[in-house]
Design a protein with these regions (language model features):
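PLP-dependent class I/II
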Residues: 4-222
């Protein structure tokens, strides 16, 4: 979910769990965006039958609690693997500041409901952003299911994703990441973040739309 914007269905996760149990495998589940999903409830891999003793959850505070830069994460794992995780941890990084740990405790309590309010705001932005991106010639964007990224198909522009990103950056001042950075299946995609304000997102799309004739000029030049 963190690379793109999709959320595994219950059916897919159940099948993964069945395979893990059948073949006695561990599942490493990155759930950093678990609280930022839209129109559905997230089910952790650990909740499926037989998975509590074979799931290692990776999570943190930078996404759901806007604690980016404080660099605090955690694992939830079976007791049998904790010694190995501790050995890895103490040889990879050292002490997290005490005040950050206290802040994390308060974040998990979330007494004021800040995270749900943040997700509601992201929901408004993702709907607006996807709708406006679809008005750009050559762009196709399904509404994101989770996180705060838009995964946009740019195949209809007729040029490579890297070239689309270059034009947007140099001529419109808008940054995106070529999808191939996340694997070969992303070669016809670019990824945007919609963690900015609605006004900034709207301005970004307007700028992209103004430079979109460059898609055709670049394709013809080739």
């Amino acid at each position: 979910m963190c690379i793109r914007d999709s959320v595994y269905t219950d059916e897919v996760q159940r099948r993964i769990a069945e395979l893990a149990v059948k073949h006695d495998l561990f599942v490493l589940s990155d759930e950093i965006y678990a609280r930022i999903i839209y129109g559905q409830n997230y089910i952790s891999m650990m909740n499926y039958p037989g998975m509590e003793e074979r799931t290692l959850i990776i999570d943190g505070f930078s996404k759901s609690f806007a604690m980016t830069g404080w660099r605090l994460g955690y694992n939830v794992a079976p007791a049998s693997v904790v010694p190995a995780l501790e050995m890895l941890a103490v040889n990879s990084y050292t002490c997290v500041n005490e005040f950050i740990q206290y802040a994390a405790i308060e974040a998990l309590r979330d007494r004021n409901g800040n995270t749900p309010r943040m997700v509601d705001e992201f929901d408004k932005r993702r709907q607006q952003f996807a709708r406006e991106l679809n008005s750009v010639p050559g762009f196709r964007c399904a509404p994101p299911q989770g996180a705060f990224y838009a995964w946009v198909n740019i195949a209809d522009t007729g040029i490579a994703a890297e070239e689309v990103c270059r034009i947007m950056l140099e001529e419109a001042g808008v940054a995106a990441i070529p999808g191939a950075a996340f694997g070969d299946s992303g070669k016809d995609f670019v990824r945007f973040s919609f963690a900015s304000s609605t006004a900034t997102l709207h301005e970004a799309v307007e700028r992209i739309r103004r430079v979109s004739p460059a898609w055709e000029r670049t394709a013809v030049a080739r």
